[in-house]
């Protein structure tokens, strides 16, 4: 594993021993990276490279536009996803891929919560990612359903994975508890438009 710092972001690169393996870009917390990688290895996943980006400003880097605080003690989401995506595409990916054993077979983008929202949003901004995974994606985010239903992805992904935990809809916060209905609606809309 090699670690870099690019624009205050920590980039951990886990190369595959096999040249030309796929590369997965995972936006995550720094304390989760090693356990994610170890669990994937324990599952016996096919050869792949993992590039984990952490030290993110979650409410800025992972959100597509401004949204006010969702609770009294929360901070607003400030809509820096486009700037972060540019950093990912123009600086992080070239530096990370220069350290890999050959060009990737394909690229995937994955994330949990707001990073899951970002993974889906990024598909509407760039055609670089062939696959994406949105784990417990923040599909409660104001305006995201309207955006998904009124825009087209830059390319049809080979695979798009959604997951949703069993506790997301049990919150008393009316903003957050719509994730239970919005995640399947996103899936159904994308499937109807032959995106999946």
Spell out what each predicted region is.
Residues 158-165:
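Catalytic His-Asp charge-relay segment
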Residues 1-22, 48:
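A domain-start/cap signature at the N-terminus of enzymes
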Residues 189-196:
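Single conserved hydrophobic/aromatic residue that forms the stacking wall/gate
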Residues 133-140, 167:
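Active-site nucleophile loop of the alpha/beta-hydrolase fold
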Residues 117-118, 142-152:
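Alpha-helical scaffolding within the catalytic cores
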């Amino acid at each position: 594993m090699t670690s870099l710092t690019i624009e205050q972001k920590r980039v951990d690169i886990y190369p595959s021993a096999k040249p030309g393996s796929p590369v997965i870009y995972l936006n995550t917390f720094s304390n989760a990276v090693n356990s994610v990688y170890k669990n994937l290895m324990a599952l016996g996943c096919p050869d792949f490279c993992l590039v984990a980006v952490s030290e993110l400003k979650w409410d800025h880097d992972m959100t597509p536009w401004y949204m006010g605080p969702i609770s009294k003690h929360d901070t607003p989401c400030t809509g820096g996803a486009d700037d972060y995506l540019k950093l990912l595409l123009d600086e992080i990916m070239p530096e990370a891929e220069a350290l890999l054993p050959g060009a990737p077979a394909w690229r995937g983008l994955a994330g949990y919560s707001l990073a899951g929202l970002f993974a889906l949003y990024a598909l509407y901004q760039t055609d670089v990612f062939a696959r994406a995974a949105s784990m417990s994606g923040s599909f409660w985010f104001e305006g995201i359903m309207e955006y998904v239903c009124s825009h087209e992805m830059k390319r049809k992904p080979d695979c798009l994975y959604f997951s949703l935990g069993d506790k997301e809809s049990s919150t008393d916060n009316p903003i957050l508890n719509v994730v239970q209905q919005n995640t399947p609606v996103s899936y159904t809309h994308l499937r109807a438009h032959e995106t999946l």
